[in-house]
Amino acid sequence: MPQILSPKGTIMKLYNSLTRTKDEFIPHEPGKVSMYTCGPTVYHFAHIGNLRTYIMEDVLEKYLRYTGLDVKRVMNITDVGHLSSDADTGEDKMLKGAKREKKTVMEIAKFYTDAFFADCEKLNIKLPDVIEPATGCIDEFIKVIEALIEKEYAYEAGGNIYFDTSKLKQYYLFNNFEEEDLQDGVREGVEKDDNKRNKADFVLWFTKSKFDDQELKWNSPWGIGYPGWHIECSCISMKHLGEYLDIHCGGIDNAFPHHTNEIAQSEAYVGHKWCNYWFHVLHLNTNGGKMSKSKGEFLTVSLLEEKGYNPLVYRFFCLQSHYRKSLVFSYENLDNAVAAWEKLLARVAKLDKNGDVDNAKFEELKRDFTDAMDNDLNTSLGVTALYNVLKADTNDATKLALIADFDKVLSLNLIEEASKLGAQEEPLDDEFTAKVEALIAERAAAKKEKNFAEADRIRGVLTEMGVEIKDTREGVVWQRI
């Protein structure tokens, strides 16, 4: 199979959670990339930790497109079946949200789906090419489950349909978990289920639920019920991307059991390797640990906006760290990002767009950026490459062209935001200058009338404004201090 090259001829490498190494990225079909993203469970607002994952997935998609690849990206919306333990126990999260807000499940799903899309727009996250809610694919779920039963990878017990993990040569792929990790009470959310043949088995379809008020149910060959969480991503991916998937993305907390179970059921169904590359983004942490809705400790984009933060500053904050490193959020750290952001915009605003682009210099400086991104999507070094452009010995037109080029991937709207900054500052500077000049004229008049006390008072006013004045033979000169 031919290798897919970046614009300068080197091969992009991505850390693959499946192999635990940086692997050369080679799509199954030359020139085309199939990419699947685990979407939100829309029972509440996405917190900024969730959104860090979507930001980094967005950067990956945009960089693949930047290199000339044809990317088709698919994402699910979980609006049924995701239980609170991420396994097969606890309350359905959608039902939990509906009870909390005294609304129907579909009302909750619509509201929080729209809220998620709004957050993505604020953060310059491109929505995937295909977005499919789980409730729209019930027929596909049933078809795959029937096939798994026929192949003896699934069984019925106690009214539910379970996947039989004992049929697999290997189950634990992303971790070092052993059987005892699934013992009752050892891992959070693991509860006893006498219907399972093996502790690692998981539900494909529920007909017997401990929730009598489960709102969403469908007819199936096994009775009225609803799908398990894990089956939806496999089915939605295969529905739109086929039996071979290049990249599967998600947060690291989804690696087990969700992604592990996806691989199990998908490969049992298709009979061959399903996905070649697994891209996992690490947690956003606070001083109290991982940000989590279940703990009731989470921040939203809207809350950051209420506190005066531009959502793009949060994106910038995320890009300054590598996706495989846990990122510590604090307002102090975000304020540091604000300071760096404002300085960056101020430098961009000073660039003169007139002139011709130096193509040789453009390609030379671009190499720093593509080297960074080819090396496991190193956005931290990618941002450094941006700063190197500003310091480079080349003309402003070339610098602006490079900034615009890098921003196809970084999506920080740097030139647009810098233009806003310049437009805001210019009238303020004119107003400030006019006020200073008026005070200097008043001081000159006071000195001419030998009213030195008034002249000293005006000097004090100017000092409080951050202005230093000097009397010279040519007149008064002033500068900010």
Set out the residue ranges of the language-model regions.
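Anion (oxyanion) recognition and catalysis
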Residues: 65, 149, 463
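Short, well-structured beta-strand/strand-turn elements
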Residues: 70-72, 152-158, 393, 468-470
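Structural preference for alpha-helix termini/caps and helix-kink/transition segments
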Residues: 290-293, 297-481
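Short, glycine/charge-rich beta-strand/loop segments that flank catalytic centers
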Residues: 74-80, 109-116, 126-141, 159-168
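The substrate-binding groove and active-site-proximal loops of carbohydrate-active enzymes
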Residues: 98-104, 130-135, 223, 251
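N-terminal, positively charged nucleic-acid-binding surface of large information/translation enzymes
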Residues: 19, 28-124, 474-478
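Alpha-helical recognition segments enriched in aromatics with Gly/Pro capping
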Residues: 2-43, 58, 117-118, 138-350
